[in-house]
């Protein structure tokens, strides 16, 4: 590599002799290119981590790292863990997002060419002491690290290199480093990523890197030269406590790029400067105490620093440097134990602290080791007789107090410039803008997973990085580069007085500051809802710093937002949402002692959540979970970034990892709900298609196979804040499984003092069985009697019960086999004719989709009846257990904590509109379930198969099958009618059990029903349903058949087609909410139906005749009028399903028999048929009558 020849630099001082001991190891990087063949099952057999959006949590390295190699996979033997991925199929992987790297691997096809670099240590010969070099030498002495090992936090060389991202920052410039600046990241930023506190680095020294030098808190690194580094930036350098960049070496930058410095760096001037430096004696910590050092050997004369400039001639050239650092005794106080002991001297290199190797250890970690010493500090040091480290010219930490080594406050040792860089990666939070140079401060927390809750939130620098730097002059450069004394200490501040109301709430020692927000508020936040929000750092030069906010202040209120109990993520988001230029009023209290305790113990956020969606594992640090799991969140701003929460899974305290934050979780839950809805629509379509076929076998298969396993939708948010509380009432009991009906009856009969069945309101017109809706008031009355309410409801209704804080005990009977179900039911209920196969299949579907609703599971054994004893014990145990209740709703009970039911009834939901039968697709539509349910009427073997799908998508009308392939809106429409009736009879509920879109569907259905009279007036359709055998050949007819349409149309007792009645039936419900009897309901319905028929019968008959005439004249276009005219589409479908000729039948019965209808006996017979069809589920309009009861 060529050396820039026209600009020399003063020679660099040598390191101490121990660094040149023989047998040292040097780290080199070897580059490999491997070609992987994708396996059909294992893929490429590797796992990658890292990336710009997923940096290493210890040092912020953003390389793409091979985190795992699958044994026996395609990469086994070719790649190793912790290989750095340089290129994938010619695409550079430097400073890219993790998702981008994964995408490149996925789209590689079957072959992937991967270029990686791998670290390797080699033995190097001992370095010989070199004579002093003059200004023309172009040599840069290589510093090698002491080869120590550490058992703590992976500080050894091996653990640093083999950890994720590595504690060893190894950044050689490999081929991709020289790619053009059009890349997302240019060469001048190759070194700017690393701001770690004292990590071993293999860093390229590029000409554009001077302003990106290390900001670490305990190390200094010799960097390359930046030709853009002008006089205004010459103070932009390391401010660390333990290392600093050579000052003469820094001035060499200006000699190389500023002609004004030529004279200052002549040989004569350098010799004089060195003489002056030696004559001044040991440097002091500050100008006020120039000779406050403890006695130490005087530094010997040594050659001055030299400057070396390395320039690449090719993009793939490497600098070949490895930089290291070590903790040393920088200063000793006169009164400290170290000075009194006499065995320590300034400049001694500390090799171990209490047995822990300090190689590349940060000052923060060293301080914590010292704090844990408990009054006994054991050090292993190496004496540096030349005192190389303490005599390197550097800037002094004027803002750090001289104190005992055990009281080092490394968090306060930043110089002004370093603090500005330390917080500069807050640009992720405080602004959408990105700084051109973004130093990383991810080394603030050594144990991020255990202490992330107390990790401060960084913030963004608002101005130029070196904009406030005082230019250096030629005279006394060493001291004129020192920053001025901190201004906040100059004079006491007078804070604004908060209002009396705020003082009464927050206390008398509250201070108030008010300022106008700039680009950012300029605050780093620590803590969380468990301990409070604290100021962890203040950006210099911002209004917050000028107004007197200090580190350790607890923020109590910002503008109108109370920060007490606020999670750290919400606090950061609130500050970000304040518009630029708006006034910010902050109420704070100085609580430095509490703040120190928070940082020591790592506490921050702490709250519990319950998930209501499913999440797969995204990264190795992530947790996978399903619906209904509970977590304790300990940090809402993991790694100082928005997007992930650090959480602990309840029930497994050792399982800690990342979960999506609230906003991401809501997005994922909405996507899953949308997919679930789409799956339901497709299932409904295929169910309708199956219903149109007349084959019994296909219907059976359709019901079982096409009833897709769809998860129950929920009204809960993605994350529900929960608390663990005891239920102060007897919780309702819901049983699922093949013997649930038997178990409920057994509990109610044998233990009447403890259990009572909640009666359901009838939903079927003429039905003698209570299979409808359950009043919440009925449940409340049972609970007030200090009994468990036995509920026969759907899984969807269970979710609603949880939403309304009824906390039901949900027990699932898990069958062992289909034969076992049959054996048990025959033994427990010999008269039951339910299909064991259907019950077994239904139980399996429940177990797959609704397991998150179960609070307990009882495994059935057909050989005995021990399940009943287990059931009683389980209910008793569940009643005594604490319940995870919604935190928000629990807060609403503070006014009346004793009266549990006062809060439950305050929800306003006086009715639980849910079906008592479990439906095949687990939606709470009425009338569903068929033989699948546990408490439905037995199906005689000789009767036709009644599919639960039929009732799930009822009514099975041919016109409806054509017009609306999806029956779901009909079920929702009926539920909406029930809800409307509820709202008429009770106060508005706090929540609506059904989606609001049902209202619109209800209107649409009513409109469509009014247009379908002419189809339903077709007597041939009725004639086809008169014979009992018709139902065995195909699907049952949608309405009970009257013997004839021969009655006079003036009489009110007109046959009622089902879809006609839906619209009118609802009107009757609005007029009379409580008919006296089923017969009264029928009469009211017939009156409303008759009014509509009087107005439209003639018009419909004429249209029917015209349609038939057109069809006969133009048979080739027979289907055209049916498709274009909405009232007609049912006619061809209806006729196609009947053997008799359909087209000629409609007109004559209307014309011939309109004048005469049947007698009252026929009317009574019709009503009986109506009742029978309703019982059997054939009557498609039964839902309207059932909902009338509400």
UniProtKB/Swiss-Prot annotation:
<dbReference type="GO" id="GO:0050892">
    <property type="term" value="P:intestinal absorption"/>
</dbReference>
<dbReference type="InterPro" id="IPR036028">
    <property type="entry name" value="SH3-like_dom_sf"/>
</dbReference>
<feature type="modified residue" description="Phosphoserine">
    <location>
        <position position="130"/>
    </location>
</feature>
<feature type="modified residue" description="Phosphoserine">
    <location>
        <position position="1159"/>
    </location>
</feature>
<feature type="domain" description="PDZ 3">
    <location>
        <begin position="509"/>
        <end position="590"/>
    </location>
</feature>
<keyword id="KW-0472">Membrane</keyword>
<dbReference type="GO" id="GO:0035633">
    <property type="term" value="P:maintenance of blood-brain barrier"/>
</dbReference>
<feature type="region of interest" description="Disordered">
    <location>
        <begin position="408"/>
        <end position="506"/>
    </location>
</feature>
<dbReference type="GO" id="GO:1990782">
    <property type="term" value="F:protein tyrosine kinase binding"/>
</dbReference>
<feature type="region of interest" description="Disordered">
    <location>
        <begin position="920"/>
        <end position="1079"/>
    </location>
</feature>
<dbReference type="GO" id="GO:0045216">
    <property type="term" value="P:cell-cell junction organization"/>
</dbReference>
<feature type="domain" description="PDZ 1">
    <location>
        <begin position="33"/>
        <end position="120"/>
    </location>
</feature>
<comment type="similarity">
    <text>Belongs to the MAGUK family.</text>
</comment>
<dbReference type="GO" id="GO:0150105">
    <property type="term" value="P:protein localization to cell-cell junction"/>
</dbReference>
<dbReference type="GO" id="GO:0005912">
    <property type="term" value="C:adherens junction"/>
</dbReference>
<feature type="modified residue" description="Phosphothreonine">
    <location>
        <position position="933"/>
    </location>
</feature>
<feature type="region of interest" description="Disordered">
    <location>
        <begin position="152"/>
        <end position="306"/>
    </location>
</feature>
<dbReference type="GO" id="GO:0098609">
    <property type="term" value="P:cell-cell adhesion"/>
</dbReference>
<feature type="modified residue" description="Phosphoserine">
    <location>
        <position position="325"/>
    </location>
</feature>
<feature type="modified residue" description="Phosphoserine">
    <location>
        <position position="920"/>
    </location>
</feature>
<feature type="compositionally biased region" description="Basic and acidic residues">
    <location>
        <begin position="956"/>
        <end position="967"/>
    </location>
</feature>
<feature type="modified residue" description="Phosphoserine">
    <location>
        <position position="200"/>
    </location>
</feature>
<keyword id="KW-1003">Cell membrane</keyword>
<keyword id="KW-0988">Intrahepatic cholestasis</keyword>
<feature type="compositionally biased region" description="Acidic residues">
    <location>
        <begin position="1060"/>
        <end position="1072"/>
    </location>
</feature>
<keyword id="KW-0796">Tight junction</keyword>
<dbReference type="Pfam" id="PF00595">
    <property type="entry name" value="PDZ"/>
</dbReference>
<feature type="modified residue" description="Phosphoserine">
    <location>
        <position position="902"/>
    </location>
</feature>
<feature type="modified residue" description="Phosphoserine">
    <location>
        <position position="966"/>
    </location>
</feature>
<feature type="domain" description="Guanylate kinase-like">
    <location>
        <begin position="678"/>
        <end position="876"/>
    </location>
</feature>
<dbReference type="GO" id="GO:0005829">
    <property type="term" value="C:cytosol"/>
</dbReference>
<comment type="subunit">
    <text>Homodimer. Interacts (via PDZ2 domain) with TJP1/ZO1 (via PDZ2 domain). Interacts with OCLN. Interacts with UBN1. Interacts with SAFB in the nucleus. Interacts with SCRIB. Interacts with USP53 (via the C-terminal region). Interacts with claudins, including CLDN1, CLDN2, CLDN3, CLDN5 and CLDN7. Interacts with CLDN18. Interacts (via N-terminus) with CTNNA1.</text>
</comment>
<keyword id="KW-0728">SH3 domain</keyword>
<feature type="modified residue" description="Phosphoserine">
    <location>
        <position position="1068"/>
    </location>
</feature>
<feature type="modified residue" description="Phosphoserine">
    <location>
        <position position="400"/>
    </location>
</feature>
<dbReference type="InterPro" id="IPR001478">
    <property type="entry name" value="PDZ"/>
</dbReference>
<dbReference type="Pfam" id="PF00625">
    <property type="entry name" value="Guanylate_kin"/>
</dbReference>
<dbReference type="GO" id="GO:0044291">
    <property type="term" value="C:cell-cell contact zone"/>
</dbReference>
<feature type="modified residue" description="Phosphoserine">
    <location>
        <position position="431"/>
    </location>
</feature>
<feature type="modified residue" description="Phosphoserine">
    <location>
        <position position="415"/>
    </location>
</feature>
<dbReference type="GO" id="GO:0004385">
    <property type="term" value="F:guanylate kinase activity"/>
</dbReference>
<dbReference type="GO" id="GO:0034109">
    <property type="term" value="P:homotypic cell-cell adhesion"/>
</dbReference>
């Amino acid at each position: 590599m060529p050396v820039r020849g026209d600009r020399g630099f003063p020679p660099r001082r040598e390191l101490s002799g121990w660094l040149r001991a023989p047998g040292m190891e040097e780290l080199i990087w070897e580059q490999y290119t491997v070609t992987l063949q994708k396996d059909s099952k294992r893929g490429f057999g590797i796992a990658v981590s890292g990336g710009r959006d997923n940096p290493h949590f210890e040092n912020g390295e953003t390389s793409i790292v091979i985190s795992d190699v699958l044994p026996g996979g395609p990469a086994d033997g070719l790649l190793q863990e912790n290989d750095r991925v340089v290129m994938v199929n010619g695409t550079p992987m430097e400073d890219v997002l993790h998702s981008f790297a994964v995408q490149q691997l996925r789209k590689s096809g079957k072959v992937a060419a991967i270029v990686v670099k791998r670290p390797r240590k080699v033995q190097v010969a001992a370095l010989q002491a070199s004579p002093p070099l003059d200004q023309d030498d172009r040599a840069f002495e290589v510093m090698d690290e002491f080869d120590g090992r550490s058992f703590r936090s992976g500080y050894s060389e091996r653990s640093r290199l083999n950890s994720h991202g590595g504690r060893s920052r190894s950044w050689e410039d490999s081929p991709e480093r020289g790619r053009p600046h059009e890349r997302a990241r240019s060469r001048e930023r190759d070194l700017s990523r690393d701001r770690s506190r004292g990590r071993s680095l293999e860093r390229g020294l590029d000409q554009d890197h001077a302003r990106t030098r290390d900001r670490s808190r305990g190390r200094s690194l010799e960097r390359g030269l930046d030709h853009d580094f002008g006089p205004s930036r010459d103070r932009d350098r390391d401010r660390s406590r333990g290392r600093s960049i050579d000052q003469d070496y820094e001035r060499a930058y200006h000699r190389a790029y500023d002609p004004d410095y030529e004279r200052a760096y002549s040989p004569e001037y350098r010799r004089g400067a060195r003489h002056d430096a030696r004559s001044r004696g040991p440097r002091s910590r500050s100008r006020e105490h120039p000779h406050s050092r403890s006695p130490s050997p005087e530094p010997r004369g040594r050659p001055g620093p030299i400057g070396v400039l390395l320039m690449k001639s090719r993009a793939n050239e490497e600098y070949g440097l490895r930089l290291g650092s070590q903790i040393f005794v920088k200063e000793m106080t006169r009164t400290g134990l170290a000075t009194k002991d006499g065995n320590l001297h300034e400049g001694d290199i500390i090799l171990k602290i209490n047995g822990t190797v300090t190689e590349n250890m940060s000052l923060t970690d060293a301080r914590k080791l010292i704090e844990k010493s408990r009054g006994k500090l054991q050090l292993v040091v190496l004496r540096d007789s030349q005192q190389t480290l303490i005599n390197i010219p550097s800037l002094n930490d004027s803002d750090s107090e001289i104190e005992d080594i055990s009281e080092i406050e490394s968090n306060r040792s930043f110089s002004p410039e370093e603090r500005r860089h330390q917080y500069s990666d807050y640009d992720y939070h405080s602004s959408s803008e990105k700084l051109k140079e973004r130093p990383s401060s991810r080394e603030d927390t050594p144990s991020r997973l255990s202490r992330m809750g107390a990790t401060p939130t960084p913030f963004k620098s608002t101005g130029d990085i070196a904009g406030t730097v005082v230019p250096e002059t030629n005279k006394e450069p060493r001291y004129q580069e020192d920053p001025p004394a901190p201004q906040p200490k100059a004079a006491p501040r007078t804070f604004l007085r908060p209002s009396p109301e705020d003082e009464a709430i927050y206390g008398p020692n509250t201070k108030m500051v008010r300022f106008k927000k700039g680009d950012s508020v300029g605050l780093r936040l620590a803590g969380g809802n468990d301990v409070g929000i604290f100021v962890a750092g203040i950006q210099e030069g911002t209004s917050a710093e000028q107004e007197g906010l200090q580190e350790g202040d607890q923020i109590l209120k910002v503008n109108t937002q109370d920060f007490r109990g606020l999670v750290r993520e919400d606090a950061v988001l609130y500050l970000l949402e304040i518009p630029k230029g708006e006034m910010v009023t902050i109420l704070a209290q100085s609580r430095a002692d509490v703040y120190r305790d928070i940082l020591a113990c790592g506490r921050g956020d702490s709250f519990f959540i319950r998930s209501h969606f499913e999440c797969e594992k995204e990264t190795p640090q992530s947790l996978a979970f399903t619906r209904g799991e509970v977590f304790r969140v300990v940090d809402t701003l993991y790694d100082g970034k928005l997007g992930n929460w650090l959480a602990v899974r309840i029930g497994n305290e050792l399982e800690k990892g990342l979960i999506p934050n609230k906003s991401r979780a809501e997005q994922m839950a909405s996507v899953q709900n949308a997919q679930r809805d789409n799956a339901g629509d497709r299932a409904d379509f295929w169910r309708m298609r199956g219903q149109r076929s007349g084959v019994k076998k296909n219907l059976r298969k359709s019901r079982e196979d096409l009833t897709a396993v769809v998860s129950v939708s929920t009204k809960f948010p993605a994350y529900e804040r929960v608390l663990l509380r005891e239920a102060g009432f007897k919780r309702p009991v819901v049983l699922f499984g093949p013997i649930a009906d038997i178990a409920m009856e057994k509990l109610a009969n044998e233990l009447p003092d403890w259990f009572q069945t909640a009666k359901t309101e009838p939903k079927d017109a003429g039905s003698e069985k209570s299979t409808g809706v359950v009043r919440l008031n009925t449940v409340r009355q049972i609970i007030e009697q200090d009994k468990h309410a036995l509920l026969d409801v759907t899984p969807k209704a269970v979710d609603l019960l949880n939403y309304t804080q009824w906390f039901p005990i949900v027990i699932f009977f898990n069958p062992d086999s289909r034969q076992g179900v049959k054996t048990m039911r025959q033994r427990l209920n010999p008269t039951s004719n339910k299909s064991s196969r259907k019950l077994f299949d239904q139980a399996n579907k429940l177990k797959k989709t609704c397991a998150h609703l179960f609070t307990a599971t009882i495994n059935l054994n057909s050989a005995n009846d021990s399940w009943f004893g287990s059931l009683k014990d389980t209910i008793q145990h569940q009643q005594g257990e604490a319940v995870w209740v919604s935190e928000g709703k629990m807060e609403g009970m503070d006014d009346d904590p004793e009266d549990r039911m006062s809060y439950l009834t305050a929800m306003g939901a006086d009715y639980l509109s849910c079906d008592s039968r479990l439906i095949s697709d687990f939606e709470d539509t009425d009338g569903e379930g068929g033989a699948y349910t546990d408490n439905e009427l037995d199906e005689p073997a000789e009767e036709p198969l009644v599919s639960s799908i039929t009732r799930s998508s009822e009514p099975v009308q041919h016109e409806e099958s054509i017009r609306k392939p999806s029956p779901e809106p009909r079920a929702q429409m009926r539920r909406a009618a029930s809800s409307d009736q509820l709202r008429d009879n009770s106060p508005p509920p706090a929540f609506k059990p059904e989606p609001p879109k049902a209202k619109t569907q209800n209107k649409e259905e009513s409109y469509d029903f009014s247009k379908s009279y002419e189809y339903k007036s077709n007597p041939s359709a009725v004639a086809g349903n008169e014979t009992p055998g018709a139902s065995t050949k195909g699907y049952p007819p949608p309405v009970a058949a009257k013997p004839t349409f021969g009655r006079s149309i003036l009489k009110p007792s007109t046959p009622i087609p089902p879809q006609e009645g839906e619209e009118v039936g609802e009107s009757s419900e609005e007029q009379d909410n409580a008919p006296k009897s089923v017969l009264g309901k029928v009469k009211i319905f017939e009156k409303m139906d008759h009014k509509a028929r009087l107005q439209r019968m003639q018009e419909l008959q004429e249209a029917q005749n015209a349609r038939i005439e057109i069809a006969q004249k133009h048979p080739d276009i027979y289907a055209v009028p049916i498709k274009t005219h909405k009232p007609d589409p049912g006619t061809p479908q209806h006729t196609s399903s009947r053997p008799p000729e359909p087209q000629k039948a409609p007109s004559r019965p209307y014309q011939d028999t309109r004048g005469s209808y049947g007698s009252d006996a026929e009317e009574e017979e019709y009503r009986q048929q109506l009742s029978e069809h309703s019982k059997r589920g054939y009557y498609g309009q039964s839902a309207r009558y059932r909902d009338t009861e509400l």
